[in-house]
Amino acid sequence: MRVFFRATLAALTVALAVPLQAQERVLNLYNWADYVGADALQRFQKETGIRVKYDTFDSAEVLDSKLMTGRSGYDVVFPASSGLARAIQAKAVQPVDDGQLKNVANLDPELLAKLATIDPGNRFGVPYTWGTVGLAINKDAVLKRIPDAPLDSLDLLFKPEYAGRLADCGISLIDSPQEVISVALNYLGKSPYSTEPADLAQVRELLAKLQPNVRYIASGKHINDLANGSLCVALTYTGDALMGAAQAKQANKPFEVIYRIPKEGTLIWFDTMAIPVDAPHPQEARAFIDFMLRPESIAELTNTLYFANANQKATPLLNADVAGDPDIYPPAAMRQKLFGEQLLTLKQQRDRTRLWSAFRTRS
């Protein structure tokens, strides 16, 4: 789901080399670049003898197209929860059949329930990573301009008295109408998936007030801009924000980039593992999914990219600064304020896209 630095490696295809044999077992993965731990892939291959071919995509739309067209040749794909919902609706994925997954019990029931808003019964998708949409903030730049800035509130974006004082140092938003509009509706006290014209009109007005203060709307670019100090606030995804923060720290920048989950609540997103309906090697696919449900397999990824995982038994294997960060693993009170994705009809999606296009054109 998330579009960040790894997308620049989208042309990469990695085939882990093993000798070709007559009855060779093969697994074809389709994922973002660098979105599986290298050690985990090597362990899987060594343990099972299955040769792994790892192809990458650089946008969710590319993956959607592959799934909807069919005959992709892939065995495991990694759609965001919104993409999984569309694939389920189009009958483009097959049931995972968790009866064959002995490690599925490691998954957090509360998170499974949130994913079930688009995959009832969790039949078609297995949570891989998860996170939130929130505020990436250059703390020093913001507090210099607004000493009493509400760093944990979307007021920072949506109230002109704050956003207007930050325009000179840069505000950006992810280019994702469904997600941003849902977050805006929730901020206004409406249902995040309201289709009422009056509610969408309020969102239109809210975004119109923000528009003069927005530097750009794009996904991915903000990571480097946060790291080098070219932005002071971005509405973005957990991992993207924390990647920018880590880059700034590693470069010894004279400022701190932080991530905050808005106190008003926000969207929880998932990247999932799913099996295309016509996957050529479905049993190998299930073997891989079960392998990634082992705590050590997914902990490697979380420690590297700062994306939370849904594996309860992986927590003891996480770095303390990751597991203890309330903006990566929020406490129970905040988790209650997180809303899952919901599939809208094509007309409802078009209504939101038109609203967003008008806002984006003016920005």
PLM regions with names:
Residues 23-87:
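Early extracytoplasmic/lumenal segment of secretory-pathway proteins
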Residues 81-213, 218-227, 244:
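Extracytoplasmic ligand-binding site segments that recognize negatively charged/polar headgroups
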Residues 276-337:
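Mature extracytoplasmic/periplasmic domains
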Residues 83-86, 233-254:
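A ligand-binding cleft/hinge motif common to bilobed small-molecule-binding domains
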Residues 200-209, 215, 253-274:
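Periplasmic-binding protein-like
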Residues 94-105, 155, 251-267, 276-278:
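Short beta-strand->loop
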Residues 136-141, 186-187, 269-281, 300:
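A bilobed periplasmic-binding-protein/Venus flytrap-type ligand-binding module shared by bacterial periplasmic
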Residues 224, 332-363:
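Conserved C-terminal helix/tail region of periplasmic/extracytoplasmic solute-binding proteins
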